């Protein structure tokens, strides 16, 4: 009967607490805070594990589609191999891409398994064990606390009543004391358990989240390793395509020689080509120390330095880029300052630098030397070493580099552009510092570090900006009657009326750069000949002494350049 009555009292007390008719005064604030933290952790971990499982399910559908794509590549490769034996290259690249795609989907499958086995399942186990045990312990604590509180209320009521026998009050007091002892013991145990559970859950969660990152690290690392192994094959395939294209162009030239207008057009193009042209040949033809296209492009970009964001990072309209590239290469009239989107001009400059012949701007032979400077810990010694390496560049290469880095340093100094030295190095570096052999992924970051250092230390390396010596109109107008050679060689004698009505701008054309360290003795063959006594011979071989020439790089239909695939929303401010 006593037990039944005690249960009635406890149930009544429990109902009163839940209906807010009686405040919970026995439970300490620490216990309430520990319970709240445990409950929140459990809820968030449940949401997290469900999201991981949902992501792996959707990724599984993508894996099925990717596997089907890989099978199609391989089937096409087998068909070409069996039925078109002359298309060995096509069959080979189809096979390699199919194998890569299949391996990539297998990597994605392993990633999903890792996310489930190493992340989701262990977190679910924490919910079902530690957190569940803590919840049950707190439930037992609440049961003991409510029983103790109910008997305290009952004892208080007995003491208020009259004609209650002392033995009954004494019995109630003894019961309350027993419940108090039990309540304190259970309270200590529950508090310790909740503390331990929260700590263990934190450690376990951090560990599993590290496993989450490790899974993705393994995924991307293996993917990059596969791509790095395929890069030499990609170069071989591209060289094959370029060779076949060249053979096709030769056959077209032989046919076009039979038709006078087409022959004249081909001859005209060879006299006006800018992109992919040997720099010494181009400068000799134009009679200048800096390509006229670069002069106009740099001036147009300078007009936007203080107002435009993302110069050299954001992409222009690819159709417009291609149209202006054609105009410049074909010697047609153009005006870069009239282009509304300055990013088109920036993309044209990157495209020109990427296709520079016969070598990239920082040359193949100096690539390893520049990369090795990253191992120099002392900043001053590193800058001095880079300066010494750059001073050994051919004179016409050094002049172009001087003007380019001057422009980049001006952009980096403008907060509005949001293009610090590191940002600029990321998008410009791969176009001027290129390895002649296999690409080493680790060297890309080191190369960007070198270019960042050059931009940051422009004044120290180059001794200041180039001198202002000549001016050039905004608009390029082709000379009349196809007498380009004579007109270009006598460019300084052309009257202003020969150009479209636009303001002439002052440009940087330093024929003898102000860095005294340039080695003229090693570059005598690269000096620009402006004499009318020695006209430019388009059939003469490129005048260059140094490392072997690199293969021509043709523009793609998309006219994209390295670094142009960024969307504006993807832009991040890199640390300088």
UniProtKB/Swiss-Prot annotation:
Spell out the Acidic residues composition-biased ranges: 565-576
Residue stretches in coiled coil = 123-189
Q: Which UniProt keywords apply?
A: Coiled coil, Cytoplasm, GTPase activation
Q: Where are the residues of the annotated region Disordered? A: 472-576
Q: Where is the composition biased (Low complexity)?
A: 482-500, 514-530
Positions bearing the site annotation: Arginine finger: 313
Instruction: Give GO BP annotations, semicolon-separated.
Output: small GTPase-mediated signal transduction
Annotated function: Rho GTPase-activating protein involved in the signal transduction pathway.
UniProt name for this protein: Rho GTPase-activating protein gacP
Species of origin? Dictyostelium discoideum
The encoding gene: gacP
